[in-house]
């Protein structure tokens, strides 16, 4: 029975204040959701990358390493190791979707959770439909899992009724402090967000060809 694990995180915010620069009173202009997709039997491999990152830079594992707080050497090392992971394991994939928030219509802005859900569907539904069992692990502090209908129910309904897939979806929110797979996904989101928000392509180029990025409302 084919199964996969998907670790889901995001970068950016769901604010809509665009009359001031980002980080100076204004909201981010982009929102990125990233997914680390790994076969169930290989879910230990991305975790090893994060453990090596902690070891190389003498970081305490009880102090979560977040992309926003990493220096350039740490970021470069992660990107190089992530690239190597994909080279050695073609069934491990990195995916992301980026929304240009200034182009989001006003009535959609009123319910950010629905925007999250829609972005995640666009990003993952066709991939999920290839598997018998999908374990989805979002960070509840960032990915909003409730919006009237939960993200889980929304995706399961889409899989069964729209994609005609018999995929069984298991959604297990976890705190990223306790999950190295989510920390990996946080770093993926940071790489993609930096490419768009700050027009910084340096680290992103280290993963080009190994990360699939969907644009929304560009």
Q: What is each PLM-predicted segment?
A:
Residues 1-218:
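Phosphate-ester processing/binding pockets and catalytic centers
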């Amino acid at each position: 029975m084919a199964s996969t694990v998907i670790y889901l995180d995001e970068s950016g915010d769901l604010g809509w204040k665009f009359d001031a620069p980002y980080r100076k009173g204004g909201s981010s202009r982009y929102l990125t959701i990233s997914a680390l997709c790994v076969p169930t039997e290989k879910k230990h491999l991305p975790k090893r990358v994060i453990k090596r990152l902690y070891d190389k830079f003498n970081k305490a594992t009880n102090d979560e390493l977040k992309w926003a707080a990493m220096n350039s050497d740490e970021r470069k090392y992660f990107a190089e190791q992530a690239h190597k992971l994909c080279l050695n394991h073609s069934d491990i994939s990195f995916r992301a979707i980026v929304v240009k928030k200034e182009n989001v219509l006003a009535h959609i802005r009123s319910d950010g959770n629905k925007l999250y859900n829609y972005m995640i569907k666009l990003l993952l539904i066709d991939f999920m439909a290839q598997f018998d069992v999908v374990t989805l692990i979002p960070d509840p502090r960032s990915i909003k899992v409730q919006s009237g209908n939960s993200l889980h129910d929304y995706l399961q309904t889409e899989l069964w009724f729209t994609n005609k897939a018999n995929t069984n979806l298991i959604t297990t929110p976890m705190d990223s402090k306790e999950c190295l797979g989510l920390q990996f996904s946080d770093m993926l989101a940071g790489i993609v967000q930096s490419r768009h928000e700050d027009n910084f392509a340096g680290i992103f180029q280290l993963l080009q060809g190994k990360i699939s990025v969907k644009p929304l409302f560009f």
